[in-house]
Amino acid sequence: MNRAGLGACASTGSARADVGSDHIPKPTQTEPVEARALPVPHGKLTPNAPLAPLVWFKSGGTAEWLFEPTDAADLQAFLADLDPSVPVMALGLGSNLIVRDGGVPGVVVRLGKAFAKVLPGADLTLDCGGGASGILVSSTARDHGIAGLEFLRSIPGTVGGFVRMNGGAYGGEVKDILVDCDVVLRDGSSAQLGTSLLNYTYRHSTLPEGAIVVAARFKGRPGKSADIQAEMDRISSSREASQPLRSKTGGSTFKNPDGHKAWQLVDAAGCRGLTIGGAQVSEKHCNFLLNTGAATSAEIEALGEEVRRRVKARSGIELEWEIQRVGNQ
């Protein structure tokens, strides 16, 4: 693979878009990529790409580089030839993410249409691309009489993100339906990982740092399409009634501590409706933070930290962020 300096816009081939947030690296102070050479892929490589339009909060800085590979082979070749010191982060639908205002160093990878397919397999399985949405996965399962995947309808994200964080809702979790997943590791090599290698716990896995999920296989149980649709409708109605779905939000902000509901702790601490700048704790569901207009990511994150402080002061419980926070302040 050829290399190009960052001074030029290394963009060739067809543009693709979208993967789950498979690993979110911690902010690092690294040498600007401009000082190094980047591989020239077949896909689209964009410098200083605004990320705010790609995330649900509609706030935050730019990606030093945004890479949209044409296929898994393109991603593998690019990562294999990329300087190992360059940070790599995967971006899905951007629903569980605060991109800090200083932007994200290194390369942000976004998987597109080539990674968004969902096909039925044998024995009540589905073969899903890492960029496929939860709605597409659950709808395809319904169409083929595969029950047990309805809960994915309620998670705003992509397969890669579900696999990385053991996504779950309404009594279901990815660990209960995952057969295995195909990942491209940071060095460009590939691996197939089963659930035993991911060591799933609540909203967490041990997916290797820098790994990107390009495909996954889910297995359900026999069901009638009408019954599956009824359950999906029930879930959809419940979300509509209880969550601020039409707001600029990142989804559930804090993990539920053992034996507690995060929203109840937030409410008891008097944080419902609390604001900092343009950021607000939702009145409808107080485990959701909102961008009410032109909030900065700094304001949104500061509001979350203030909520954590107040909850700790009142209940002694330290809330853990469920939303990922990436990039430089």
What are these regions (language model features)?
Residues 1-40:
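Intrinsic disorder/low-complexity segments
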Residues 38-159, 169:
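Anion-binding (especially nucleotide phosphate/pyrophosphate-binding) glycine-rich loop
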Residues 66, 127, 180-182, 215-217:
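Beta-strand secondary-structure signal
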Residues 116-118, 179-183:
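Short polybasic amphipathic segments
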